[in-house]
Structures are given as C-alpha cells and as structure tokens.
Amino acid sequence: EVDCNPAICPYAKGHFDRVNDAVYDLLQKENNMTREVLLAHAKEYQVCPFEMCLDTATWADNIIFDYNYVFDPNVYLKRFFADGIKGDYIFLVDEAHNLVERGREMYSAALVKEDILAVRKIMKPRSSAIEKELGKCNKLMLEYKRECETYQIYESIPNLIFSCMRLAAKIEEYMQKNPEFPGRDVVLDFYFELRNFLNIYERVDEHYVIYGQHDEEGRFVIKLFCVDPSFNLQECLDKGNATIFFSATLLPVQYYKELLTNKTDNYAVYARTTFSQDKRLLLIGNDVSSKYTRRTPEEYGRIADYIYRTITVSYTHLTLP
C-alpha cells in the first residue's frame, strides 16, 4: 500500500520542486507515454509517477484509463471533469457492457453497523463527543436491524443521515487536530465511507432503492443502491462532445441504451465480423474456469497449456481431454 506522506515516501518529498523539469523532459523526448516510460522518468527525477502522469495528460491527444477516472464521483479527474467544465472530448468506451454494473457500484454506497462499533471502540478513550455520536448512530442502525429479518426496503432514512452528518463533522475536526493516533487508518477509512454515504444520499431519487440486509459475514448493512445509473452516467458524458460505446455483447441493445445514458436519440450500429464463419473452429476445454474461486496456479497452468497447444500445433492434431 502506498503512503503519500512526504516523511515516508521519497517520491512525495520535494515532488513539486522537481516535477516541472520531469514533465518538460518527458514531453521533449517521448510521443508515446506508456506505463514503463512514465515510471522510468518518475524514478529518474524522484517524483510521484501518478501525479506526473496526471500533469502530462494535459498535453496528450489520447488518454487511456479506467472507467472510474471519468465516472466515479470520488476519483474522477477534476482537472478535466470538474463541475462546470466541458471539454472538447470524445469518449471511446470499450467493453461498455461492464459499465452498467460498474456504474451501479460507483453510484451506490453502504453503511455497516459493525464498522461503527469498531470505530467507537477506538475513539472511546480519545473523544467522548465522537463516541457519543457513534453511539447514536449505532442505536439508529440497531432499530433498522430489528425491522430486518433478511432484507428490508426503507422509503427514507432521515434520522440516520442527520446523525451521520454530525458524526462526520466531529471526526473531521478531530483528525485535523490529531494527525497521528493508534487506529487512525481504521477511523480514516470509516470517515471516507461515511462521507461517500452522505454524498451518494444527495443523489438518491426514483432511480435508487434504500434497503437493509445481513451480508455474507453476518454484518448488518444499509445500502443506497443505484438501480438505474443512466442519469448519473449522463452527467459525466455531458462533459464531452460525444461518446461511442463498444462491446461484442451489448445485447439486448435497448437495455444498454436505457441504462448507459438517459438520452432517447442514441443509435446503435451493428458491425459484422471480418472473419469468415466457415473458418471458425470452436474448441471447449471444460476442465478449466475463469471463475474467481478457481483462480489458482494450477488453473492458470491448464489454461496456459491450452493456449500453447493451440498456437503451436495444427488444429487437426489438437486433442482435448
């Protein structure tokens, strides 16, 4: 895990004294700024590679990055997509069928009762005011928990939200005055989750469902779930001039058109494959899986063996178990 504290990270210490020279040198020498090139220059100048990458991006014609740098309300690149900023951008979204679920995740939030108790234990000997607010928050969560056997939908949760707002303000004030204390990382993570919960609640409308449930670990969770992310995604898409969604699996297309954007005048283009189906050979290795629970060295080895045998022998001699 990266710690951006200048007292710990040599790349963070004095970063701003050296980064301008690093960016200038990079722009003079390189046209294709790959990960390897950026890391090499960052190491040479002892600057933060991530921050240098962001600075360099303002000179780039094409930028390749993950969805979250455009769509995630917590980590989007503010230098490009801050409120009120519209750029001369064209968004090319690959594997767009994944954006629906990712959009739901990015615009949803959860509050876990057990996390409140964990932070309360840390803060009890340090701040009676915070411990008291955590107790109020926990009491409200307990009331919701008693209503919930397995799954419970709530129309609204105003009392909990007001309690969370008071709690977030007190934690923020305490951490500004106390930069170091045992358990600070746990409290900081909880604070960010709490802030995200409050920020997402401001977006809650008819496209959301608020519900409580017991998760797989038995913890009680209240979730602000974004069922339809199209309006939130559209806010981001409006920061550019146009968007093209690519995917080989955007079917049924009307489903994706309705959940990826709230515009009604979008159109779909079906592109035929350039490969002849007469030359297609379908081979199935049914002893391997890409499921997360099956991702082991042995599984990787079997998959790699299939790939190797496929590219090194004629298909007429390829046998599968």
Annotate the PLM regions.
Residues Y45, F50-N62, Y67-F162, L250-E258:
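Signature of the SF2 helicase/ATPase Hel1-core->accessory helical subdomain module
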Residues K291-Y315:
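Conserved interdomain hinge at the start of the Helicase C-terminal
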Residues M33-R35, K279-Y292, I311:
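Gly-rich Lys/Arg/Thr-decorated short loops/hinges at beta-loop-alpha junctions or inter-strand turns
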Residues E1-I63, F71, K139-E143, E147-Y154, ...:
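A substrate-engagement module of RecA-like helicase motors
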Residues F91, K136, N159, S163-R166, ...:
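Charged, amphipathic alpha-helical oligomerization/scaffolding segments
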Residues H41-T58, N74-F81, P179-I284:
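A contiguous, basic/glycine-rich beta-loop/short-helix subdomain that forms a polymer-engagement track
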Residues T316-P321:
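Conserved small/polar residues in nucleotide/adenosyl-binding loops
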